[in-house]
Amino acid sequence: MAKTRVAVLYGGKADEHSISCISAASFMRALDPELFEAVPIGITKTGTWFVDGQDPLGWNLAEGLPEAVETPDSREVVLTIGDGGDGFHARNADGSLDSLGHIDVVLPALHGPFGEDGTIQGLFEMMGVPYVGCGVLASAACMDKHYTKVLLRAAGIPVAPGITLDTRHYDASDEFATDGEEFLRQVNEAGLQYPLFVKPSRAGSSFGVTKVEQIGDAAALAAAVFEASRHDWRVLVEQGIDAREIECAVVRIHPTDPTRAALPGEVVLDRRSEGDDQFYDFDSKYMDSQASHTEIPAKIGDDLIARVRETAVRAFDAVDGMGLSRVDTFVTADGDVLVNEINTLPGCTSISMFPQAWEAMGIPFRTVVTDLIEGALA
């Protein structure tokens, strides 16, 4: 029987480029060689698609963060939209095109903008090529934390209080220094309590997130908004929640299937080898092996475990999720469960919660990946 040919996309234009490369390596290692043939397609930081680059199978976090770059043997990928799965080609040095063969399904191991935000999903919808993961609407809505909260509130699912700023209306020439008082006015008007977390609405892996602790510090707030605006013009200012951050992996293999939730886990901060140790930022996620460890299931008791799983399923269904996601929640000391965000293509590195959560339930990551691909093809 012919193997299913899976185009694994990695890299991309987003800040999470390197994490995408590592996730792609994990996905490729999880592909059952008896069932699937991987066709790795890299995307450079400037957006060029290529084949015949470095082998992603050689990448891992222990050796640092890789980058999808062309090699002397690389060839640019050209898509012919109307040809569907036969529309993947490689451009030769003389300008001629070679077919990459029929692509049965795409596994977009891409995080952040241009990969997790509905844009590439729309491309494959137009091509008529099946792909793993959430569709256009769910991807776009969950990439934008503001609109995620709009949808979740409408579904009656609690979220953290906050405000949204359109920084295009303010003066970035002085890094918003003259706008700090206006930002502070809006924070006070909304009744937000400190500490505040200021974050880009459309970014992942904790890029651009700043914690503001000093009450009434307009300068610190302005600086935090400017840092977030470097990643997205839409910026969220959220009230810090005195809670534990509990993450829950979910899957829905086929539209008629119920959403399934894995055992929730918690990333426990230990210590940072250097820098601020107060929240789980990019460095403590990926660059500092001593910063944290993962506990699955989270040590929150059976009742809260069940409620987190139920909330994660409700949140995923509320945004019409499909395939896979990781739902990040806050669990307060009073037992309240709030949704922080939904990651429609969660990190799948060796230290990431999504693969570990299923493994903790006795379900190998290879089985999950096989199910996701077969579900996309159904």
Curated annotation (Swiss-Prot):
Single GO MF descriptor: ATP binding
GO term, biological process aspect, one: regulation of cell shape
Top-rank lineage group of the source organism: Bacteria
Pathway(s) the chain acts in: Cell wall biogenesis; peptidoglycan biosynthesis
Domain ATP-grasp stretches: 149-374
Cofactor field: Mg(2+); Mn(2+)
Keyword Kinase annotated: no
Binding-site residues for ATP, renumbered to this chain: 189-247
GO CC terms of this entry: cytosol
Binding site for Mg(2+) 2: E341, N343
Subcellular location as annotated: Cytoplasm
Transmembrane segments: none
Protein name: D-alanine--D-alanine ligase
Protein's organism: Bifidobacterium animalis subsp. lactis (strain AD011)
Phylogenetic placement of the source organism: Bacteria, Bacillati, Actinomycetota, Actinomycetes, Bifidobacteriales
Gene name of this polypeptide: ddl
